[in-house]
């Protein structure tokens, strides 16, 4: 629900929809424009930079949808028909002889002159090898017409389409060996906090294992990003400045932790020094604090340090921002009307997301 329409305002809290709108506008102002030609085998997860236009009809010729017998319906008036040829997938049939039928298999091209296929379960063969059709027939039954799925010249995938198994299979069916895609988004990932320790190391007093960076790197790789692992930053302003300054070649710096208004908010301090910081308190739980700014011209998104908050804000806000920079238009998270599983109160943030272990999934 939009806080502007809910009658339950939260002063100082930005509705998630408004935050997403701002992020998408910022993304559109700095699109990734470089284009690469990549082989289909390397295109999974990439974003199409040029429309995919059908270079042939699909199917390229009329073919049988069933194992059965192909005939010209005008030749049949209830009599048995002799078999004049046998057609398998990949064969080049000859024109159908008048008054005959052809044994045909699924996917095989229909012979010239045939317009109907009867499935093999509905026929009988007599001792002479002639075919008896036991049921009424209709012109075009069990036939996949040429161009039934796609016509030559049609745009089958638009600019900005994300390429996955279905899209790549479609491109292959049209004979495309390479596709024009946006270059990968270069994203640096860092975590902040003296309390963080890498998995496998011994924990000291007050320390926790760093899970957020591994979560984000895995998700970014699935999005097709080129990831720079910038490690863990201690709570030190000078070290933060140095780390951010060394990442000038990336398209985005994605950090977790250090986005509060406390004394240890060294990421925010560094961005304030650069003069480009927006600290948004979102009407969402988990995930209230979110930082967006620039450091020496490089966009920076600061996510909360709590793992649940990191997961939610990345999925709802950072991920759409990155996809929009690559030209993807449909980036908004899908919404579903489902039971909330908790009592609504005006003291709650505008979006309250319950954990999976409580409700089986995240609910809005």
Language-model features: locations:
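Intrinsically disordered, low-complexity, positively charged segments
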Residues: 11-80
């Amino acid at each position: 629900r939009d806080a502007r329409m809910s009658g339950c305002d939260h002063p100082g809290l930005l509705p998630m929809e408004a935050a997403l709108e701002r992020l998408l506008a910022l993304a559109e102002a700095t699109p990734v424009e470089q284009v690469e030609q990549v082989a289909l085998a390397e295109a999974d997860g990439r974003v199409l930079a040029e429309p995919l236009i059908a270079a042939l009809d699909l199917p390229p010729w009329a073919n049988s949808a069933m194992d059965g017998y192909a005939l010209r319906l005008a030749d049949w008036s209830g009599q048995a028909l002799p078999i004049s040829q046998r057609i398998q997938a990949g064969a080049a049939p000859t024109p159908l002889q008048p008054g005959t039928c052809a044994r045909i298999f699924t996917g095989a091209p229909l012979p010239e002159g045939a317009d109907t296929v009867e499935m093999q379960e509905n026929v009988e063969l007599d001792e002479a090898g002639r075919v008896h059709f036991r049921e009424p027939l209709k012109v075009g039954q069990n036939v996949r017409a040429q161009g039934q799925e796609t016509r030559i010249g049609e745009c089958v995938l638009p600019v900005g389409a994300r390429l996955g198994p279905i899209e790549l299979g479609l491109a292959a069916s049209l004979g495309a060996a390479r596709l024009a895609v946006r270059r990968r988004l270069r994203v640096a990932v860092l975590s902040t906090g003296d309390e963080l320790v890498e998995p496998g190391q011994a924990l000291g007093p007050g320390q926790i294992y760093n899970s957020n960076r591994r979560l984000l790197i895995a998700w970014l790789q699935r999005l097709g990003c080129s990831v720079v692992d910038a490690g863990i930053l201690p709570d030190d302003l000078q070290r933060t400045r140095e780390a951010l300054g060394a990442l000038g070649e990336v398209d985005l710096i994605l950090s977790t932790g250090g986005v509060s208004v406390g004394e240890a908010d060294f990421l925010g301090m560094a961005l304030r020094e650069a003069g480009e910081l927006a600290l948004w308190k979102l009407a969402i739980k988990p995930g209230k604090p979110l930082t967006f700014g620039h450091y020496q011209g490089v966009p920076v998104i600061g996510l909360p340090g709590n793992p649940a908050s990191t997961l939610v804000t990345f999925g709802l806000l950072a991920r759409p921002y990155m996809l929009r920079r690559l030209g993807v238009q449909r980036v908004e998270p899908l919404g579903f009307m489902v039971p909330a599983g908790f009592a609504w109160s005006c003291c709650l943030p505008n979006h309250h997301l319950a954990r999976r272990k409580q409700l089986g999934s995240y609910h809005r």
